[in-house]
Amino acid sequence: MPTVDLYNIEGQKVGDLQLAETVFAVEVNEDVLHQVVVAQLANKRQGNQSAKTRAEVSGGGKKPWRQKGTGRARQGSIRAPQWIHGGVVFAPKPRDYKMSIPKSMRRVAMKSALTSKVNENELVVLESLELDAPKTKEMVKMINAFEGKKPLIVVPESNEVIYKSVRNIEGATVVPVNNINVYDILKHDKFIITKEAVSKIEEVYA
């Protein structure tokens, strides 16, 4: 069972915390991680790109000049792709990029992502994270104490005070524990999470 240090908001060690082996010490499945991240990014795409083909642009019904005898290259329409204002060849059209991932695969990916953070010493567990009022300065001090440049800060539930304290810090993101996803975990260099949020993760994934 992996054991990690437990810190306060000042970055001082205040104890140890044992993590569930079935969540934070599994075999990292990079293939599944890749598939889930690709699916998440695909699902974020709007898919509303669109351009007109030569059949859709206006005009061009008349042949611009006769076929032979002008000395110029033959042309059939001023809306052919080689003309200015002509239609687009293989024009992109709105489409749905959504990909579905089985629940079992999402669970494997989440456990693999969490384990990778433990293996790479990028997991920081806080005893608690509470502020009386929004204080960006306090959050900057905490992030610097753990040498984080792009931290993902995970709290037990939505917290407006913490959110306002972090929103102006470049690279930092705050999410409630029930909104974490594999892509966010992997793209941030530090995974800062409260002890209570760890317990909630273990309840779901253990």
Swiss-Prot record:
It comes from the Bacteria. The keyword RNA-binding applies. Gene3D superfamilies: 3.40.1370.10. The keyword Ribosomal protein applies. Keywords: Ribonucleoprotein, Ribosomal protein, RNA-binding, rRNA-binding. One of its GO terms (cellular component) is ribonucleoprotein complex. Residues 45-76 are annotated as: Disordered. GO terms for molecular function: rRNA binding; structural constituent of ribosome. GO terms for biological process: translation. It holds the Pfam family Ribosomal_L4. Part of the 50S ribosomal subunit. One of the primary rRNA binding proteins, this protein initially binds near the 5'-end of the 23S rRNA. It is important during the early stages of 50S assembly. It makes multiple contacts with different domains of the 23S rRNA in the assembled 50S subunit and ribosome. Belongs to the universal ribosomal protein uL4 family. This is Large ribosomal subunit protein uL4. It comes from Clostridium novyi (strain NT).
